[in-house]
Amino acid sequence: MLTERNLQDIEECGARQFTEEETCIIADVSEKEYECNPEARRRYRRGMLKAQFEVRETVRKMAAEGVPQMVKIFQSYIDRIEFPEE
């Protein structure tokens, strides 16, 4: 059974973009235990998404300041969004 500490380690590894295999080693859990635990997989994904959120927030702020490279990157994020037709 995974402890809260294991789950925290898994989420932190996700945030740092470690692979799932590396995450299991760092969190000291078996790959099978990780794969069979929906909460562990959710926490890993959550960590990854939170890190992406932070990066995108930095890109957004720099684009708003007019940094050309960041404007281009931010525009690429916008271009990937599919808006529903009204």
Residue ranges and their predicted role:
Residues Q52-E86:
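Amphipathic alpha-helical protein-protein interaction segments
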